[in-house]
Curated annotation (Swiss-Prot):
The protein's name in its UniProt record: Bifunctional purine biosynthesis protein PurH
Cited CDD domains: IMPCH
PROSITE patterns referenced in this protein's UniProt entry, alphabetically: MGS
NCBIfam families: PRK00881.1, purH
Comment text on domains: The IMP cyclohydrolase activity resides in the N-terminal region.
Single GO molecular function: phosphoribosylaminoimidazolecarboxamide formyltransferase activity
Keyword terms, alphabetized: Hydrolase, Multifunctional enzyme, Purine biosynthesis, Transferase
Length: 532
């Protein structure tokens, strides 16, 4: 370790910069800087030398060339313990630079803005910043390099602990972080530019695609005990409500299957603005309900769709969990609970269940910037597609039967349509009064999915001691078109009175005729929701 005497500071994100540099100044560090960063430091009472004065070469080309100079990169790359390097530096008047604090032009944020032009994107490609970061990181044994404001406190703590020197282990960590950051930065530039056509217009998908994820946690094992696994988050992180942004408040470490299933529950509960509850088992919803103002009622209805399958499941809620809801949930063994918040009494009650995993995801239901790409790994390759985020445009439903749905039926059809989107194909959902009654998931034939959903609803009603048909007057949703009329016949036989489906089959007329024969209302969405 060597004492830090000179730092080069040039940042786009100035968060926490002034107190950090004031802390450096307390250790006798002098500053080199450029442009707006230099102005900020001077306005804060710090002495700063312009890089152009240090190099003896002016900034030029509208600021495109500031730090690309041998006196900068020689000062960063020269090995302090190499006599030849030191001799050459002396001969050319190159002085060592002991610290680099640089973060990059906001390319990712720029291209994320609607209407970003090629010229705007190009001007936000940083050249000097990555060059300095890479030079400093290559010589990390002698140079401390900081690219993330979150590391400022750690660096100052190390300087205080080591008399103005930065710990060698921390230097190595910071260097690794630099190469991860510059790799992600270059990937963002490459992905965006390679998606442009020859006229510079955004295309569909880039010719090459590079992604970066950051490790969140290791795991005991993967989907099965013989598989190794770890959980990674997008880098840079998304602001969207997700498992990657969740805070675990208690319980055992999340397993591979916990995270996979919890993601399905969270994505489904995000569909609803009213108080909603979702119960998921093996990534499929086994119960969903919405209630105008009562989360407890919504949870009870969701659980009671299929209480047998709910045992050991995942629960997602889109409102703060109070003690009344907590008491109801506590009657059932569950693996994970997801909610935006919990009141103190609820937390105290859940604390008695030490293994229960409790997750807080604050921005459930809040419109945020989202990652719009869906990645599916196949052996030897990657399938890349838009995420299935499209909502039904208002007025887009097409009534195709002689009878139109009533207002109540339409509410249930739209509810069931939101649910079926999150069920593995082939998928059928029966619903009534804003709650699921039966879910048929992952079947090779659509009619079998319908039969399973009917059986689940009838079995649950029978177990509960109910005599009436639970599906009488229900709405039925299908994630894809009916290839034959048998699915509609099965729904009518079960008691359903309304159907929502994409349409588009060569036998649509036959299917519509079946619905008319049974006095059912049917609407087409023109949109399919396969899920594999």
């Amino acid at each position: 370790m060597a004492k830090i005497k000179r730092a080069l500071i040039s940042v786009s994100d100035k968060t926490g910069l002034v107190p950090f540099c004031q802390g450096l100044a307390e250790h006798g560090v002098s500053f080199l800087s450029t442009g707006g960063t230099a102005r900020l430091l001077r306005e804060s009472g710090l002495d700063v030398m312009d890089v152009s004065e240090f190099t003896g070469f002016p900034e030029m080309l509208d600021g495109r060339v500031k730090t690309l100079h041998p006196k900068v990169h020689g000062g960063l790359l020269g090995l302090r313990d190499n006599a030849s390097h030191q001799q050459q530096m002396g001969e050319h008047g190159i002085e060592p630079i002991d610290m680099v604090v640089v973060n990059l032009y906001p390319f990712e944020a720029t291209v994320a803005k609607e209407g970003c032009t090629l010229e705007e994107a190009i001007e936000n490609i940083d050249i000097g910043g990555p060059s300095m970061l890479r030079s400093a990181a290559k010589n990390y044994r002698s140079v401390t390099v900081v690219t993330d404001p979150a590391d400022y406190a750690r660096v100052l703590e190390s300087l205080r602990a080591h008399d103005g020197q930065c710990d060698a282990g921390l230097n190595a960590q910071l260097a690794r972080k630099v190469y991860a950051r510059t790799a992600a930065y270059d990937a963002a530039i490459s992905n965006w530019l390679s998606a442009l056509d020859n006229e510079g217009r955004p295309g569909a998908f880039p010719e090459t695609y590079t992604v970066q994820f950051k490790k969140v946690q290791g795991m005991r094992y993967g989907e099965n005990p013989h598989q190794s696994a770890a959980f990674y988050a997008e880098s840079p992180p998304s602001e969207e409500a997700s498992l990657a942004t969740a805070t675990q408040l208690q319980g055992k470490e999340l397993s591979f299957n916990n995270i996979h299933d919890a993601n399905g529950a969270l994505e489904l509960v995000k569909e609803f603005s009213k108080p909603a509850a979702v119960v998921v088992k093996h990534a499929n919803p086994c119960g969903v309900a919405v209630h105008d103002g009562d989360l407890l009622a919504a949870y009870r209805m969701a659980r009671d769709t299929d209480p047998v399958s709910a045992f050991g499941g995942i629960i997602a809620l889109n409102r703060c969990v109070d003690v009344a809801v907590a008491k109801e949930i506590a009657q059932l063994f569950v693996e994970v609970i997801i909610a935006p918040e919990y009141d103190e009494q609820a937390l105290e009650l859940f604390a008695t269940k030490k293994n229960l995993r409790l997750l807080r995801v604050p921005n459930i239901g809040v419109a945020t910037a989202v990652s719009t790409m869906d990645l599916k790994r196949v052996t030897g390759g990657l399938l890349l597609q838009d995420r299935d985020l499209k909502q039904l445009p208002e007025g887009s439903l097409k009534v195709v039967t002689e009878r139109a749905p009533s207002e109540a039926e339409m509410r249930d059809l739209l509810f069931a349509w939101k649910v079926v989107k999150h069920v593995k194909s082939n998928a059928i959902v029966y619903a009534k009064e804003q709650r699921t009654l039966g879910v048929g998931a992952g079947q090779m034939s659509r009619v079998d999915a319908s039969r399973i959903a009917v059986w689940k609803a009838q079995d649950t009603a029978h177990t509960a001691g109910l005599r009436e048909n639970p599906l009488l007057g229900a709405a039925m949703a299908s994630d894809a078109f009916f290839p034959f009329r048998d699915g509609v016949d099965a729904a009518a036989k079960a008691g359903a009175k309304a159907v929502i489906q994409p349409g588009g089959s060569v036998r649509d007329e036959e299917v519509i005729a079946a619905a008319n024969e049974h006095g059912m209302a049917m609407v087409f969405t023109g949109m399919r929701h396969f899920k594999h």
